[in-house]
Amino acid sequence: GADLITFHIEVHPDPVAHAKDLKNMGIKTGISLNPSTDVERVLPYLEHFDLLLVMSVNPGFGGQSFIESVIPKIESARMHIDKHNLSTLIEIDGGIDENRAQRVVDAGVDILVIGSSFFGAADREAFTKQVQSLKR
């Protein structure tokens, strides 16, 4: 079964209650933030979540271009997590290639979702090693 369930803050009226229900079932929780949503909307809830998923493309289909305006959102979330000594991880999904990977890691991302760039890489092994070597 699922060990972690992530849901979008934009569609859930009471994210904390939902997170508590999931945690009571032994499931880790994640909350997702769409590119157009203000990061301030999710910050007050991070203490209740194991993961913040920042969408860097609009949800729906692969191969979209990275939306640059998510970088300051990542930085704000990382500052909030560090300031409050939270264990919440930051994951990013959408438009991540070998050039953007280091930028988002520098901004505070812990987990990268990479699809099109990996599958389109001429040398997937080299691509994977490059991404694995990234350090904040």
Task: Outline where the language-model segments fall.
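Active-site-proximal glycine-rich helix-loop-beta segment
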Residues: G1, G108, G115
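Conserved anion-binding
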Residues: A2-L89
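Short beta-strand and adjacent tight-turn residues that come in two discontinuous sequence segments
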Residues: F7, I114-G115
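Hydrophobic residues in well-ordered beta-strands that form the structural core
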Residues: I31, V113-I114
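Catalytic cores of alpha/beta
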Residues: T37-F49, G94-L112
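Short Gly/Pro-enriched loop/turn and capping motifs at secondary-structure junctions
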Residues: N58-G60, G95-N99, F118-F119
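C-terminal helical cap(s) of enzyme catalytic domains, especially alpha/beta-barrels
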Residues: V105, F119-R136
